[in-house]
């Protein structure tokens, strides 16, 4: 009887310690996404700076591409912007922007001021497209394959290390290089 009184708290402690150990070993930048391995959500939206033009992910079928979620008010987006500019100049894969929860005109002005790495950037003022993609915040980047399937999701600013070690090798693999 006395033995059971001591074993129960010990067992509870070991279970809690196990969950804690698993949690501490996870990368906080890698938020789980149920969309990995699934077709990217379809949408049709006006483009930043050219509302008469409309973009849909179905236009990218047959290409490996990046979807980068950004906003003019996002400080981290400014941090990653030089990396996106460099990546776009290398023409490794087309980059599509998703201007998330911004005011009309702010995104276009921001791109004019800082440079435009996107083949097109769509306007998502209410964040509905972002919700469909499970966006937690900005910036976020998705790698989407030739069939429109999401292969990678990265929350946070893109770094040179991330481009060199994960994104570019994945794109080359998906392109059969």
Residue ranges with predicted function:
Residues 25-27, 46-52, 121-124:
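Short gly/ser/thr-rich secondary-structure transition/capping motifs
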Residues 6, 112-117, 124-175:
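Thiol/disulfide oxidoreductase modules built on the thioredoxin-like
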Residues 43-66:
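A short beta-strand-turn-helix
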Residues 1-46, 177:
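N-terminal targeting signals for export/organelle localization
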Residues 78-115, 125-131:
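Structural microenvironment flanking redox-active thiols in thiol-disulfide oxidoreductases
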Residues 39, 63-65, 69-73, 137:
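Short pre-active-site segment immediately N-terminal to redox-active cysteine/selenocysteine motifs
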Residues 42, 92-93, 118-119:
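A generic structural signal for alpha->beta connector loops
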Residues 66-68, 97, 143:
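Hydrophobic beta-strand core positions in alpha/beta domains
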């Amino acid at each position: 009887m006395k033995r059971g009184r001591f074993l129960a708290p010990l067992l509870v402690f070991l279970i809690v310690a196990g969950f804690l150990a698993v949690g501490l070993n996870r990368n906080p930048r890698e938020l789980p996404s149920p969309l990995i391995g699934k077709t990217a959500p379809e949408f049709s939206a006006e483009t930043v700076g050219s509302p008469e033009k409309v973009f849909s992910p179905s236009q990218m079928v047959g290409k490996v591409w990046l979807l980068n979620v950004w906003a003019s008010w996002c400080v981290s987006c400014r941090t990653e912007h030089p990396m996106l500019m460099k990546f776009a100049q290398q023409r490794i894969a087309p980059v599509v922007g998703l201007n998330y929860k911004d005011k009309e005109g702010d995104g276009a002005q921001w791109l004019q001021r800082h440079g435009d790495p996107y083949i097109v950037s769509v306007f998502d003022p209410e964040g509905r497209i972002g919700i469909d993609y499970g966006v937690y915040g900005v910036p976020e980047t998705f790698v989407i394959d030739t069939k429109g399937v999401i292969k990678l999701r990265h929350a946070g600013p893109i770094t040179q290390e991330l481009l060199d070690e994960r994104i570019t090798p994945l794109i080359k693999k998906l392109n059969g290089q």
